[in-house]
């Protein structure tokens, strides 16, 4: 009931119709979410560029995902899919752009795990509560030196959803 759920005449659980619409909202529009991003140098520099973003929920979230059906998946997709398929709660997301972390062999999985762990440490959550998303050039490994340097510097804010979006 607190979530606006109700059972209809068939006993199916549905959302209440008295929901609030948020126009021009973002990932931090909902209460309890904060985000931030930084330019780490993964992409070409620009005044409005960000290439690593973090998203945090102040409480565990139940998640669902739609993933690529391509036979070649990046380790970032594989890790996030495992978290979602495992049914565990999620509290954070790390997203990077500029490098897809795809078609890079075993190093891609090592790097995706480390990036998730770095994000988890910064967010104060467990690494199995973090999803990772990478987009960009295929065949290039995550630049872990840049990620190690810049992830701890990301400042999170309740109104920084646009910053996070710019990093995707």
Report each predicted region and the residues it spans.
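Short acidic, glycine/serine/threonine-rich loops at helix termini
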Residues: 66, 105-108, 141-146
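Short, Lys/Arg-enriched N-terminal segments with co-localized hydrophobic residues
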Residues: 2-14
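Alpha-helical support elements that line or immediately flank enzyme active sites
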Residues: 94-124
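Glycine-rich oxoanion-binding loops at beta->alpha junctions
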Residues: 62, 67-87
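Short coil/turn connectors at secondary-structure junctions
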Residues: 48-51, 73-74, 87-92, 125-129, ...
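Short beta-strand segments
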Residues: 55-56, 94-96, 132-134
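Glycine-rich, mobile lid/loop segments that gate access to catalytic sites or pores
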Residues: 113-168
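N-terminal amphipathic/basic leader segments beginning at the initiator methionine
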Residues: 11, 15-70
């Amino acid at each position: 009931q607190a979530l606006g759920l109700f059972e209809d005449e068939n006993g199916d659980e549905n959302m209440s119709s008295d929901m609030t619409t948020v126009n021009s909202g973002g990932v931090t529009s909902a209460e309890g979410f904060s985000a931030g991003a930084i330019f780490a140098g993964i992409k070409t520099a620009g005044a409005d560029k960000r290439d690593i973003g973090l998203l945090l929920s102040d409480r565990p979230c139940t998640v669902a995902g739609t993933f690529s059906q391509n036979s070649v998946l990046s380790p970032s997709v594989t890790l996030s899919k495992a978290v979602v398929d495992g049914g565990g709660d999620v509290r954070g997301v790390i997203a990077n752009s500029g490098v897809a972390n795809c078609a890079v062999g075993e190093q891609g999985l090592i790097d995706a795990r480390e990036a998730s762990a770095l994000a988890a440490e910064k967010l104060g959550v467990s690494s199995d509560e973090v999803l990772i998303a990478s987009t960009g050039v295929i065949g290039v490994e995550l630049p872990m030196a840049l990620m190690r340097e810049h992830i701890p510097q990301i400042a999170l804010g309740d109104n920084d959803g646009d910053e996070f979006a710019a990093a995707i």
